[in-house]
Amino acid sequence: MEAKVLNGKELSTKIKEELKIEVEDLKKNNINPGLAVIIVGNDPASRVYVNSKKKACAEIGIESFEYALEENTTQEELIELIHKLNKDDKVSGILVQLPLPKHIDEEKVIYAIDPSKDVDAFHPVNVGKLMIGNPDFLPCTPAGVMELIKESGIDITGKECVVVGRSNIVGKPMAMLLLAQNGTVTVCHSRTQNIDEVCKRADILVVAVGKPEFIKGSSIKPGAVVIDVGINRLENKKLVGDVEYESASRVASAITPVPGGVGPMTIAMLMKNTVKAAKLQAKMK
């Protein structure tokens, strides 16, 4: 059987269209969502991501403010800019494009963002709220994955869910969101023994390790839903995920493609968080 393709591009377009209508309504009530995007240095991949975030803002009607800083910007200068944006009423959400240059401490920079404007949901306050099951914002990639799982039609309750990868950005919050939906969750990582056997138990498999085609079809339970968060460029310039698509799609019941799966959903969820931030801030005034 051929797996159902979970098309993140189509789903993200639908979400953005709904947000566009919501933003039009908010503007009638004088609530104008705005997203400040900070990029330090000129990493080409970061530039691509920033451009797609700005494009999504334009499609929805969210005002975007870009701050492109030189590679040699100091940590103090960056934090000073963040403090300024924290106080700026035109800015509902602040996003610092990662990775940052080596001389800047990412943790300190994330801590500087006002939690009510932290639309990436990386601040410890937002991480803590997620842990106790009362989040204001959901981390964008895991939230996008949850929407794709919903699209697959599988009910998470009681299912074996395996997350491969334990990063703060994807793996850990992913496990929390699956747990919140009553999944039975196992997290695997580089030190996990018999990783293939663990993956084979999964009804829902989410892979986010940054290793090209790391999980093969032979490690997948027949009929599983497979979500591939990875995006890796091979030497021949081809983009592939962390799952070997060809072999996996013959075993899974549903699978995300790379590109066009999780990536567009991450951006749609960022937009959703920015709109929510604008609404929460309007209530606080």
UniProtKB/Swiss-Prot annotation:
The keyword Amino-acid biosynthesis applies. One of its GO terms (molecular function) is methenyltetrahydrofolate cyclohydrolase activity. Keywords: Amino-acid biosynthesis, Histidine biosynthesis, Hydrolase, Methionine biosynthesis, Multifunctional enzyme, NADP, One-carbon metabolism, Oxidoreductase, Purine biosynthesis. One of its GO terms (cellular component) is cytosol. The keyword Repressor does not apply. CDD domains: NAD_bind_m-THF_DH_Cyclohyd. It comes from the Bacteria. Pathway: One-carbon metabolism; tetrahydrofolate interconversion. NADP(+) binds at G165, R166, S167, S190, I231. It catalyses: (6R)-5,10-methylene-5,6,7,8-tetrahydrofolate + NADP(+) = (6R)-5,10-methenyltetrahydrofolate + NADPH; (6R)-5,10-methenyltetrahydrofolate + H2O = (6R)-10-formyltetrahydrofolate + H(+). One of its GO terms (biological process) is tetrahydrofolate interconversion. Pfam families: THF_DHG_CYH, THF_DHG_CYH_C. Its EC number is 1.5.1.5, 3.5.4.9. Gene3D superfamilies: Leucine Dehydrogenase, chain A, domain 1 (3.40.50.10860), NAD(P)-binding Rossmann-like Domain (3.40.50.720). PANTHER family: C-1-TETRAHYDROFOLATE SYNTHASE, CYTOPLASMIC, C-1-TETRAHYDROFOLATE SYNTHASE, CYTOPLASMIC-RELATED. Belongs to the tetrahydrofolate dehydrogenase/cyclohydrolase family. Homodimer. Catalyzes the oxidation of 5,10-methylenetetrahydrofolate to 5,10-methenyltetrahydrofolate and then the hydrolysis of 5,10-methenyltetrahydrofolate to 10-formyltetrahydrofolate. This is Bifunctional protein FolD. It comes from Acetivibrio thermocellus (strain ATCC 27405 / DSM 1237 / JCM 9322 / NBRC 103400 / NCIMB 10682 / NRRL B-4536 / VPI 7372).
